[in-house]
C-alpha cells in the first residue's frame, strides 16, 4: 500500500481530470481543433488531422491507426501521432488507443507550459496530501497521458474520491469542477462490442461505464481499477498483476456492490488486525 504501482490505462482518467480543469479555467474547449495547438505540424501529410477535436480524443474517436507495437521510444510523440494513418475518417467509431490521451497531455502542456502532473499538483494533488508521482514522459516533457503513471493505492482513492461526491472532498471543498465530473463519467459514446459486458456499457471522457447503474471506473491493464459508486458513497481501488483482466472483474462483481448493503458490521479487533497484516504483506 506504500509502494507506487504502475497504473497503465488508469492514467487516462487522471489526464481527463487535467482537461476538466483546463476547460473550467477557459484554457480550451472540447470543440477546439487539435491542429490549433500545434501549428508547427500543419504540413502533416494527413489532411484528416484538421478535423480532429479535443472531444474526439477524449471519447476515443480519432480513428487513428496505431498499435501497441508502434515505437514509444521516439522523441516526438505528437509528430508520431499526426503522421499516423487513419483507420477511418475521424469521429466514425470508437477505437481505443492510448495515443489519443498522450495528445491530450501534449495539449495541456502546450497551453499551460507545464506537464500534466505539474498542472494537477496545486489543483488536486497538494490539497489532498498526495505527493507528486512519477509519470513517464517524452523528449519534449509531455507526460505519457494514457499510460506510465505510478501512484499508491491510497493516493488513488484520494484522487478519485471527489468523483463520487460531485467533485467535492470529504469536507465539502470543491476540488474538481462538478460539471466535469458529471460529463466525464456519464456515457458519451458507445464503446466496444468484444463480448465482455464490462467493456460494452459505454465510455465517457476517459472513464468506463459499469454494468451496475450509476457507476463507473478508471481502468488499466492487468487489473488496475478504481470502481466508483456514488449511490453507495463508495469507491474501491485495485492494483493487481493479473494477465487475464476479466478474472479480476468476475471476482469483483461477485461481491460488489452487494456487500455495501450489509450495513455496519460489529467490531472485531482480531479480524481487523488480520486484514491489516494481510495488506502489509501484499
Regions inferred by a protein language model and the residue ranges of each:
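Active-site SXXK
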Residues: 5-31, 57, 104-108, 156-162
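Active-site helix/loop module of the DD-peptidase/beta-lactamase fold
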Residues: 6, 24-60, 83, 112-147, ...
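Structural recognition of the beta-strand scaffold that forms the well-ordered cores
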Residues: 8-9, 56-59, 95, 132-135, ...
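A small/polar active-site loop signature that marks catalytic segments
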Residues: 62-137
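Active-site-proximal alpha-helical segments within enzyme catalytic domains
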Residues: 100-107, 147-169, 224-241
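Flexible, glycine-rich surface segments
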Residues: 126, 131-181, 185
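Active-site Gly/Thr loop motif
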Residues: 130-132, 182-235
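Structured C-terminal helix/loop/strand segments within mature extracytoplasmic catalytic/sensor domains
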Residues: 215-282
Amino acid at each position: 500500500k506504500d509502494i507506487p504501482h504502475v497504473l497503465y490505462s488508469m492514467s487516462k482518467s487522471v489526464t481527463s481530470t487535467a482537461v476538466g480543469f483546463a476547460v473550467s479555467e477557459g484554457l480550451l474547449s472540447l470543440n477546439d481543433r487539435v491542429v490549433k495547438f500545434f501549428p508547427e505540424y500543419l504540413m502533416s501529410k494527413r489532411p484528416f488531422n484538421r478535423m480532429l477535436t479535443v472531444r474526439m480524443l477524449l471519447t476515443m474517436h480519432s480513428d487513428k491507426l496505431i498499435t501497441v507495437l508502434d515505437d514509444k521510444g521516439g522523441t516526438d510523440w505528437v509528430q508520431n501521432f499526426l503522421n499516423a494513418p487513419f483507420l477511418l475518417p475521424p469521429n466514425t467509431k470508437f477505437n481505443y488507443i492510448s495515443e489519443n490521451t498522450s495528445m491530450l497531455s501534449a495539449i495541456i502542456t502546450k497551453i499551460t507550459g507545464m506537464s500534466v502532473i505539474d498542472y494537477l499538483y496545486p489543483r488536486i494533488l497538494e490539497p489532498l496530501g498526495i505527493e507528486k508521482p512519477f509519470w513517464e514522459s517524452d523528449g519534449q516533457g509531455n507526460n505519457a497521458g494514457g499510460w506510465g503513471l505510478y501512484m499508491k493505492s491510497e493516493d488513488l482513492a484520494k484522487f478519485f474520491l471527489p468523483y463520487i461526491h460531485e467533485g467535492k472532498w470529504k469536507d465539502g471543498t470543491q476540488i474538481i469542477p462538478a460539471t466535469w465530473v458529471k460529463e466525464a463519467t456519464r456515457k458519451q459514446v458507445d464503446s466496444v462490442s468484444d463480448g465482455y459486458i464490462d467493456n460494452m456499457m459505454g465510455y465517457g471522457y476517459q472513464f468506463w461505464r459499469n454494468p451496475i447503474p450509476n457507476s463507473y471506473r478508471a481502468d488499466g491493464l492487468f487489473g488496475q481499477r478504481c470502481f466508483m459508486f456514488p449511490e453507495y458513497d463508495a469507491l474501491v481501488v485495485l492494483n493487481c498483476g493479473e494477465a487475464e483482466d476479466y478474472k479480476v472483474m468476475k471476482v469483483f462483481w461477485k461481491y460488489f456492490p452487494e456487500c455495501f448493503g450489509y450495513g455496519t458490521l460489529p467490531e472485531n479487533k482480531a479480524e481487523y488486525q488480520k486484514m491489516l497484516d494481510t495488506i502489509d504483506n501484499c
